Amino acid sequence: MFKKFLSALLVSSLWLSGAAMAQTKQIKVGVIFDMSGPLAAGGSNASYLGTKYAIDLINERGGVEGHRIVPIYVDAQSKTEVAINETERLLNQEKVDVIMGVFSSAQCVPMAQRVDQAKKFMWANVCVSSAVFKDKNLRNVFRAQVHSDQMGEASCRFLGENSKAKLGKEVKDLKVAIIYEDGPYGAGVASGNDLVCKQLGMQVVLKEGYAATSPDLSPLVTKLRRARPDVILHTGYNPDITLFLRQAKEQGLKWDALIGHGAGHGQFDKLFATFKDDANLIMNVDPVAAQLLDPKTLRPGMGALTAEMIKRYKAEVKADEIPTHVSMGFNQTWILLSDVM
């Protein structure tokens, strides 16, 4: 029923100019990601590439019911104001039928409202903030992605299940610090952390937000040294994650476990290049990368699709590690173009 509703809504949006669409046999899609600026290396560029591969494959297979997808790729430059302005341009000047993509939740929240007000269709591939939808009553914006409070819950439940066996401490004795970039993404995950860790009986000894653009996180490191947590739950982008880890090591901050929640924490190749073996001590909560799933448990043909995605990424990027953001971009786009449209 949900798929039928989505399909009906999308059809009504796409076919407002039915005669012209039928003649051109095209669907114009505006794709917004950060290909430059700090968010690019934090997962946005990988998300863009995954999205691009899915669109290319759909077109190579004949498009969506014979309609070729015509993507207009836009670089938001890691700036919210650029993402908003480009959304307006794509809707009003390029006359796109669909807006999709979006890595940053700080961009996603205002973009979703603009697209919904314009009564156009938006499909969010990567941004996770629960604030995109919470209490908004959006009618034309959709996301198959996990929500930020769910990510925050997941890390706490993981700790609750493994505290005794892996850390040698009862849950009630576990001291947790929650640190996060103070935008919609970080605040959303931290809210889930705070709620669920306390529900499970853990001691939250510090909860502190910071600006993702901060040039110095040493005051935060000092607070953590005073709080002496067993576990640090960190939600950040890039390069704030790198800055924090570097300054934490310089100041001798110790922990039993550090758990990240996506973005820069999911870019393992970059973490290993910067921190070498220290990166082995970092865990991450994220949707599972497609290549880590057993293809026999998936719908027929999905294993071959995943292999093609990996092949194209390795050929373009010349990398051995495939970040989960490639799968996010690819999978969410494939769902839209093959199952919804």
Feature locations, PLM:
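Extracellular/periplasmic periplasmic-binding protein-like sensory domains
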Residues: 249-330
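Extracytoplasmic "Venus flytrap"
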Residues: 27-52, 74-81, 103-104, 179-188, ...
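Beta-alpha junction/loop-to-helix N-cap segments that form part of ligand/metal-binding clefts
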Residues: 42-47, 56, 61-135, 144, ...
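Signal peptide-proximal N-terminal region
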Residues: 24, 48-71, 163-171, 198-202
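Extracellular/periplasmic bilobal clamshell ligand-binding domains
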Residues: 332-341
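Sec/Tat signal peptide C-region and signal peptidase I cleavage site
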Residues: 16-22
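Bacterial N-terminal signal peptides that target proteins for export
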Residues: 1-9
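Extracytoplasmic ligand/sensor domains, especially the bilobed periplasmic-binding protein
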Residues: 49, 96-207, 258-284
